[in-house]
Structures are given as C-alpha cells and as structure tokens.
Swiss-Prot record:
Recorded GO CC terms: cytoplasmic stress granule; cytoskeleton; nucleus; site of polarized growth
Domain AGC-kinase C-terminal: start-end pairs: 1030-1097
Transmembrane segments: none
Compositionally biased residues, Basic and acidic residues: 574-583
SUPFAM superfamilies: C2 domain (Calcium/lipid-binding domain, CaLB) (SSF49562), Cysteine-rich domain (SSF57889), HR1 repeat (SSF46585), Protein kinase-like (PK-like) (SSF56112)
Basic residues bias spans: 747-763
Documented EC number(s): 2.7.11.13
Record's protein name: Protein kinase C-like 1
Length: 1097
C-alpha cells in the first residue's frame, strides 16, 4: 500500500468528475438501504440501515461542499495571473478549522474533512504498531518453543493472534477512509491536521470515571440463531487492561467504572465478541487522556462564562462599529475621571471554599463516540487530574510563583548540543530509524533526534557550527539529495527531527533518488549522504579510524621518545561566564567610541581571569618582592584600583553612563603586613580557606569627589589575592590609562581641587548590621524579609537566597544579572522601579538589601477591593513607563504580575523582583528560556519558541485584564490547563465593557508576536499612542504630578499590615543550612557585594 504519491495530480475538472461519481454512488447506497428497510421487520437491521443512510447523507454533504469550493476556485483560476494568485491565497485561507482530536472521534464530528485526514494518518500509525507487535510475538513464540517453554510460547502465540485480528480491523477501517478521501492537495491544505502543542503529550495522573450506556451499528460476529452472542467492552490504559464490562446480549450496559491512572497517556475502548470461548475484537477506538482533560476544561470555561454575557471581541457590538457601550461611563474607555465599578462576574466569590467549588465545577463529557471500522458507543467520561504541586489556578485571583526551566545537561558531539528530552508520542531515531519512545537526545540547535545509545555514533557536524569549529570525521561521500514536494498519504517520520510528517503536500519533501522524507524546513539540515544511511556512514568511519593512527597519537609517541624541556605554566581557557560575556559584547560595543573599544579589547587579551589565576602555579618571588606583595588595606585603598570580577557588569557600566559614582565594597582576603612570608604564600595558593563570608573585613570606601568620579574597572576582584608582581604593576598602569581615557571621553568634568590623599570613612557591611522584623513574601527562588538597620534605624526589605540552591540550579549568572538590573534601575532613580541599597553575602546565602515599600502589593489590594476603571488605568500607566525604561536599557522583565507591583505610601507603584530579567534584549533580539508565571506567559514562550521583548506587552495585557475585571483571561486547574488555554483559547470580554478598553486588550493579547501592540521599533510608544490612553499626559505620570486615586493606610513606619498574613505570620528567621560549599562553588559569588551611592542604611 502506497503511503505517498508523486506531486503530479489530477486537474480540477477530473477531481470534480470524481466527486460527482462519489455523490452518485452514495445516493444509490441510500436507495438500496431504503429498499432493504422496507422489506424487514428486524429492529436491529432497521436501526443499522438508518445509521448507514445518515452516514451516506453526511458524505454527500461533504462531497457537495468540496465540489462547490473547487468550482469557485476554478472560476477564479480562469482570471488573469495576478488575480489568480490573490484568489488562491484567499481560497486557502478562507477556512481555518480549530478542532481538537477528541472532536474528530465523535460520531457527530463538526468537520468530516478533518476527521478523514486525521483517521487516515492515525489508523496507518496504529497499523504499523500492530504489525510490529505481531512480528515480535511471532519471534518470541519461536524462541520459547526452541527452549521447550510451551506455556510461554502459547502466550506469545495468543498475543500474535490478537494482533492479527486487530490488523484486520485496522485495514478495513483504513480502506473505508481511503475511499472517502479526495486526492487533491489543495484540500489537504484546508483540512490539515493541527500540530499538537508541547503540553498535549504529557503523561497524566488522576481518576478516570467511565460509564458505558450502549453501543450500536457494530458488525458483530455471526452466530447461530439459537445461540445469543456475548459482548463486552474492554478498557485499556496504555495497552494494559484496567476494566471490562459484564457480558451483554443486547449491547446495553449500565455500568460505571472508576480507574486510577498513574502517568498514563492513551485510553483504548475495545468491543469484543465471544467466539469459541475466546473474546475477539470487533470494534475499537482510542483517545488521549490529555484530549479528554482539554475537553473537560473547555466545558468548564464555557460554563463559567456562558451565562454571564461574555463574548469574543469579534462578537461584541461595540467592537463591530457601533462604538457605544452599555453604560455611559464606560463608553469613553476608562478615563481618569471614570470611577464606576466594572461589570460584575459570577466567578468572583471570595467566600467559596476550594472543595465546594470543585464539586460545583465537576464536569463530565457525554457523547456518541465513533468505533472503527464501524459503529458508535454512547459513553459518559470524567477525569479528575491530580494536582501534584498543589497549585490551584481556578477561582479568584491568587498568588502563583514563577517557574524557570532548569538548565539541561549538554552532551556535545561534532558541534551538536544534545540534551535529553521527553516525548509522549512515537518518534523516529534519525540515525538508526527505529522507534523512539518517551526519551531521546535532541540537538538544541538543529533539532537532530536520536537514541541515547546512538548520539555517540553521529558522524555529521551540527549545521549551526562553522566547518572549522569542530574536527568531525569526514567522508568523501558528498552526494546531495534531490528533495521535491510530495503528497503524503500515510504515516512517515522526518529523517532529521524524528517527528511524524503531516498529511498532504504543504510541508513534506522526498528525495527522488534515495526516497528519504523530511519536513520542508529540515531539508537544509539533512547531510549530503544520498544513497547512504547515517548508520552505514558511522560503520565506515569506525572502520577507517580503527585502521589508522591519529596525528595526536603519533605526537604522543614522539613526545615519549624524546624528553622535552620544561614548559611554562599553561593558562586554562576562560570560564563560561567570561565567554558568554565576550560573546555578547559586540552589541554593546556599538555604544562606545572606537578608541575606548580598542583599549578594552587589548586589556582583555592581557589580563588573566580569576579562573586562570585559580589554576596557575604559584610564582616564586625574591624576598624583596614578597615584602612588596603584602598589601595593607590603607595603601591599597589609594594606590591601586579595586577590580570587579563581574566583567559583564563592568562592561555594561562602561557602555552606559560611566559618570555614575559608585561605592565599592571590597570582597578580597584580609592580609596582615606582619604575618610570616610562608603563611602569606600559603594563603595566596588557597584563598578560600579563610574566605571572608561574613564580610568581617569588608570595607565600604566612600571616595572623595574626585575619586568617586572614577569609573570602576570592568575586571574587579579578578586578581585579588594574587601576588603583585612587576607584571601585575604594569597591568595596573594599563588599567589606570584606560580609566583616564574613559574619564576624558565619557565622564563629566568636575572642578575639584581636593587632594587624592584625603582620608576615607569606612564601615562594615554584613548580616549583623540588620535586625529582621517580619516576612514580607516568599517565592520559588527565595524569601523577602523586613529588616531594620542597626546603625541608622532605617527600614529595608532584604531578599535572601541560598547559595546551594543557586549552585544546584546553575543560577549564579542569573543572580549577577539581577544585581546589574538593580544598578540599572538605580542609575536614574526611576520613580516606578524598586531601588537597591546594597548587597552582600555570607557563607551560605546572598542578600539584596532593597528599599522598603510599605503599601503592600497590588495582589493584596485587589483581593480586598475591586479596582475602579480609573485606578486600574492609573496603575497601568505607571507600569507602562517602568517597562519602557527597562526596554530602553535593553532589559526584558518577563515576570510582570500583581504580586510584583508594590504600592508606595503616596499611592504610586514600584515594580520589584528582577530575578527573571534578561539583559541585552534590544529590538529584534530574541531568547528562548522557558520562564515566567504561567498565567502571564506569552504563547511563544509556552510553545518553546524564540521570543523577543514583546512578551512583556502580552503580560501587560494580562495584568490590565486582571485589574479591570478581577480575573484572569485564561483559566484552568493547573499549569498545563493554563498553557493550553493561552495557546488555543480566544479571550472573551463582558458585553458592556467599553470599546477602547476591549481594543487595547485585544491588541495586547494578540497571539502572533509580530502583530502585537508594542512589538515594533517604537516599543512602548505604540501603546502610549493607543486611543485608550488618549487622555493621559505621560510626562505628568512620570513626574508623579497626577494625584493617586488610592492612598494605602499605613499606621506607622513599622506597619506591615498591607502584606499578606500568610507571610507576615511566619517567624522572621533564617533556617539552618547544612550544605557545605566548596571553594569552586564560592568562586561563583566573587564580587557580589556592593553598596549603592544613595544607600540610606
């Protein structure tokens, strides 16, 4: 049976004639069924013929609709070429179905064309699987028989017999749908099967309730008239029988079966007749647990919004051109003067308990399911998912922590960056061609997929790497494939990415020489091995490598034959952090003058990094030089420069506003000039034996006016603790030269005549300087506590993160990025961004000391009282300006939500929590980290695609929706429900919401990021120019000239009553940490400590 056909196709006239013949055939079938029905009194036969007549009539309707569409297309194709092109695109795009797989297995299917395409592909896949089962059981039976194990051989033979029976059913069903199919690729495009989302194949755990009422129109096994047949329905979960009904002789049951499923995927319903004491399958169908859960979720959403007048934006009268809302106060679009409450909604019930709400929202699916090859089953289904992480999303607004995808272990091979991935559908290994279930190794760059055992055998280099990057073994076999479009009418897998190929011709290519098939987007990734499989290429290369000696091995033998002179110490490669920083550097260099860039790059090439110093052998120095090495902190403070370990931050400070004065917290080892020289050298070898975790000797050096204007070098703390040789002195001189050039090119001139030898005021910074008063909040990544400075009695909020958690999750660079974002916010003292006082570290934790905002967060306030339109718009304007500042500085926020927006005592907002911010994100820059809070994540993040800074505007739309309507636009019981709602659901709005409000929400919540409001080069200005904000003077907003619509109640400076009691009721203490970090782990936090210029603590 052919599974693909050449690209040649019938002309439209031939297709129309074929359709007419099919219509005439179905009409004759209906006539024959009517004749048989008149000549019999058997109720079963009459019912069966009625169903056949209904089925044939639906086929006639489908053929008639298809023929009319093709006729209209032919009429348009007869026009001139330009209009023909336009009409073709319009014909193809005029029908875009959006049906789930569960919709397609229903008897009353909403789209017969989609069902035909889906069942053709699905049945062929099932047929391939059953054929493999049959072959495997046949081999097992033979092997057991050879070993004399007759019982095991009979069991395997029974499995083979059942597989053969299923194969007969599948072949019969496949022929039925092939007969219905229309062989024209233009309609394949119309009825293309939807791509499953990345969450649609997850294994689910929960309780499945199945209630089978009856079956009908099933072709039972013929039996003697005196002997009634016995029929049962068997329910299998992932090919394992879990339940079966009692035998029935009239196809009726009234049984309810409850099945506990654990990490399962597929449910099978098989109707079986008893024949010679053995039950034989006569009809079968399958559905995914996820598809059932998605069907139930959609019913819950429809139940919540159906009775309260919520409609999609396209169906609302005010967006269709009428312009007027229901209420006069809402027609203008929520101006600052609008104080009317927003439309109520039946979902806002603050007193409903989760248990009672769950009982009320219990929804089941009752429907007729189609059986293959024929028949229907009336069934009632319910599935209650187990919420393993305890996060409930349904109901009123609540707090939900952010998530971040854990960095995966990377396995490199010829430039491929292989990571282990989970797949919940059948995949194909691109190397050996065998099926791959559940897990496989996929390249992060080119998406090459293979088994874990096969990734070491990959012979081709990753297409994303240049040819000189990796020394991959080469074959002289260089014959390119000849890929051409092909119409796929079967189940085939891509020879590169391993995914199943779609039905039709739109996205499928086949080599006309060797026959391999792939997606259209994968053709340039397939290696030029036409006529040779990758497995064969691997075997040839292995043979070649085993018969020759590599050049490296020959050099190794020569080096052992002749002694070599001693070599100088070899510097190791830069750390990954340094490489990443240097890799990102060009986008910043465009902001620098050319001369400064030249100086910096020269300096980078000469100055060793901390990782290099860590592996260098100790340098033996003469006694005089050793005496000079011991730096007292006083001499060091004036004569040398404190160099930062965080090269990324240092570079960023040189690139943006270098004239910002900074207070430097030294994080180096404390030395005593009177110590013994041998002890000094021992300390320099292992500086972390007595690391200054508690910042006992950390000094805050407040510089004089002239010294404060000096910009901190981009390489602070990299050479601390290393003996200062003459070469180091020369490097320090170079640093000073760079600084002088930067001062001339970038800093403001100061008329200061003060001496550089002025004394400095010093103070200690550490955990003992603060007293914890209360817990303000907790998240997935840390805890925030209210603290009081013991020196100034000022209040501050301290974010505490455990080092072992940071190391375990590879978040050290993220923490450094968060610090840099804080400094960016401090740079202009933006009124709507949270500012940083200082940050420091202890042996087991790091601390961000931030300004304390006593008004609480917006989540706490919206749970107490609904926001008026005026208040919601006021907060939205200030949030908009805060995000604009971030975007103007190349930062995407990625965690916008009510929990992260704080309210000051004057009623203005402050955006806080910069843990998920991403730097170097300018217009058209993209990233792909899966992170954020589920309800606020943009569709492109959920789909695992690369995304840009417009994800913040999607989150801004969700935030505005929540503030205006006091609920989320996307609902579900857990994260997977939320993700699928974000990808698939259409946002609904109250019918009396104003026109401009609906339009701005619709523009922000556009699933296509390229069409989303704010996605253009103007960024936030696009949103500011929207008619919804027509009455807003953003200059007044930025300067806080507009009176706040609400002032939070604060009794005293120490009042924290505006924060959630869930947090404030906890005891403010640090839990003991038993983890001991190695010196290598502590190295990741070098240079973290810092005090801002405007710190008031």
């Amino acid at each position: 049976m052919s599974t693909s056909q050449p690209s040649q196709q019938q002309n439209p006239e031939q297709v129309v004639n074929d359709i007419r013949q099919k219509i005439e055939k179905e009409r004759k079938i209906i006539q024959g069924f009517n004749d048989v029905k008149r000549n019999t009194n058997n109720p079963e036969v009459i019912q069966k013929w009625k169903s056949k007549i209904i089925e044939s009539q639906s086929m006639i309707d489908y053929y008639q609709e298809t023929m009319n569409k093709l006729t209209r297309q032919m009429q348009r194709l007869n026009t001139n070429s330009s209009s023909r092109t336009a009409s073709r695109s319009s014909v193809i795009s005029e029908y875009k179905p959006s049906y789930s797989n569960f919709d397609l297995i229903k008897y009353e299917c909403p789209s017969l064309g989609n069902k035909i395409q889906f069942m053709l592909q699905y049945l062929e896949f099932k047929l391939q699987v059953e054929n493999k089962y049959s072959e495997a059981n046949k081999k097992l039976s033979h092997l057991y028989l050879m070993d004399g194990d007759k019982s095991s051989s009979n069991a395997a033979e029974g499995g083979r017999a059942e597989s053969d029976q299923r194969i007969q059913l599948l072949e019969k069903a496949l022929k039925k749908y092939q007969k219905f199919s229309i062989n024209d690729h233009e309609f394949d495009r119309d009825y293309e099967i939807m791509d499953s989302t990345k969450h649609s194949r997850k294994l689910l755990t929960g309780r499945l309730t199945v209630s089978i009422t009856c079956i009908r129109d099933v072709d039972h096994i013929a039996t003697a008239l005196a002997k009634k047949r016995e029929t049962v329905v068997v329910i299998k979960v992932d090919d394992l029988e879990k339940a079966r009904t009692k035998p029935s002789k009239n196809d009726n049951w009234n049984e309810e079966m409850v099945i506990d499923v654990d990490k399962s995927h597929e449910i099978e319903l098989a109707v079986m007749d008893k024949q010679n004491g053995i039950y034989v399958p006569v009809a079968v169908n399958w559905f995914s647990l996820f598809d059932l859960a998605e069907e139930i979720r959609k019913k819950k959403v429809a139940k919540d919004q159906g009775s309260s007048g919520w409609l999609p934006a396209a169906n609302l009268p005010q967006t269709g051109g009428s312009g007027a809302g229901t209420g006069s106060s809402m027609t203008g679009g929520a101006s600052y003067g609008a104080t009317s409450p927003l439309p109520a909604h039946n979902d806002l019930r603050p007193s409903v308990s989760p248990s009672s709400d769950a009982k009320e929202n219990k929804v089941s699916v009752s429907t007729w399911l189609s059986l293959e090859p024929g028949g229907q089953m009336l069934i009632n289904l319910n599935f209650e998912k187990s919420i393993t992480n305890g996060k409930q999303f349904r109901g009123p607004l609540g707090r939900h922590g952010a998530i971040r995808q854990k960095k995966e272990e990377v396995f490199e091979k010829h430039g491929h960056q292989f990571v282990q991935k989970q797949f919940y559908n059948i995949m194909s290994c691109a190397l050996c061609g065998e099926f791959l279930r559940y897990t496989g190794y996929q390249c992060q760059d080119c998406k090459f997929l293979c088994h874990k055992k096969c990734y070491q055998k990959v012979v081709t280099k990753c297409i994303s790497k240049s040819g000189s990057d990796y020394d991959a073994a080469q074959l002289n076999h260089r014959i390119p494939h000849r890929f051409e479009p092909i119409t796929n009418h079967g189940t085939k897998w891509c020879c590169h990415c391993g995914y199943i190929l779609p039905w039709g011709k739109k996205n499928v290519r086949k080599c006309t020489e060797c026959g391999v098939m792939c997606h259209a987007q994968c053709t340039h990734l397939v290696p030029d091995f036409c006529g040779m499989s990758l497995q064969m290429a691997n075997e040839i290369l292995a043979t070649i490598e085993s018969t020759k000696v590599s050049p490296k091995k020959a050099q190794h033998q020569q080096s052992h034959a002749k002694p070599l002179p001693p070599k100088p110490p070899i510097e190791s490669k830069p750390s990954m952090d340094s490489e990443e920083t240097l890799h990102n550097e060009p986008s910043y260099k465009s902001l620098r003058p050319a001369s400064v860039v030249h100086q910096d790059t020269n300096f980078v090439s000469k100055l060793p990094t901390t990782v290099q110093n860590k592996y260098q052998e100790p340098v033996e120095l003469p006694p005089q030089q050793q005496n000079q090495v011991v730096p007292s902190t006083r001499r060091r403070g004036h004569g040398s420069t404190d160099l930062s370990f965080e090269t990324g931050y240092g570079q960023q400070q040189h690139q943006h506003h270098r004239d910002v004065p900074q207070i430097v917290v030294e994080d180096h080892q404390h030395y005593n000039s009177n110590d013994n020289r041998d002890v000094e050298m021992e300390e320099s070898k292992d500086e972390f034996d007595n690391f200054d975790y508690n910042n006992k000797y950390t000094e805050n050096e407040i510089l004089t006016d002239v010294q404060q204007d000096q910009v901190r070098s981009p390489f602070a703390d990299q050479i601390q603790g290393v003996p200062e040789t003459s070469h180091a002195k020369q490097q320090n001189q170079q640093v000073q030269q760079v600084q002088q050039q930067e001062e001339l090119g970038h800093q403001r001139t100061h008329s200061s005549g003060k001496s550089g030898k002025s004394k400095r005021r010093k103070r200690k910074v550490g955990l003992d300087d603060f007293q914890f008063l209360a817990v303000l909040g907790k998240g997935n990544f840390g805890k925030v506590m209210l603290a009081e400075s013991r020196h100034t009695s000022k209040l501050c909020a301290i974010k505490v993160l455990k080092k072992d958690f940071i190391v375990e999750n590879d978040e050290a660079e993220s923490v450094k990025s968060e610090k840099r974002v804080f400094l960016t916010a401090n740079k202009e003292m933006h009124p709507f961004l949270l500012n940083l006082h200082c940050c420091f570290q202890t042996e087991n934790r790091i601390y961000f000391v931030m300004e304390y905002i006593s008004g609480g967060d917006l989540m706490w306030h919206i749970q107490k009282n609904r926001f008026t339109a005026k208040r919601a718009k006021f907060y939205a304007c200030e949030v908009l300006l805060g995000l604009k500042y971030f975007h103007d500085n190349g930062i995407v926020y990625r965690d916008l939500k009510l929990d992260n927006i704080l309210l000051t005592t004057k009623g203005h907002i402050k955006i806080g929590d910069y843990g998920l911010c991403k730097e170097d994100m300018w217009h058209k820059s993209t990233t792909s980290t899966f992170c954020g809070t589920p309800e606020f994540m943009a569709p492109e993040i959920v789909a695992g695609k690369a995304y840009d800074r417009s994800v913040d505007w999607w989150a801004f739309g969700v935030l505005l929706f929540q503030m205006l309507l006091c609920q989320s636009p996307f609902k579900g019981d857990d994260e997977d429900d939320i993700f699928n709602a974000i990808e698939n659901d259409e946002v609904k709005y109250p019918i009396n919401l104003s026109r401009q409000t609906v339009l701005v929400l619709q523009a922000l919540l556009t699933k296509d990021p390229s069409q989303r409001l704010g996605s253009g080069p103007k960024d936030a200005e696009e949103i500011m120019e929207h008619p919804y904000f027509h009455d807003v003077n953003f200059d007044d907003v930025l300067n806080c000239r507009i009176p706040a619509p609400y002032i939070p109640e604060v009794q005293s400076e120490h009042d924290y009553s505006n924060f959630d009691k869930e947090f404030t009721s906890e005891t403010p203490r640090l839990t003991p940490v038993e983890t001991v970090l190695t010196s290598e782990m502590q190295e990741q936090f070098r240079g973290f400590s810092h005090i801002s210029d405007n710190a008031t603590i």
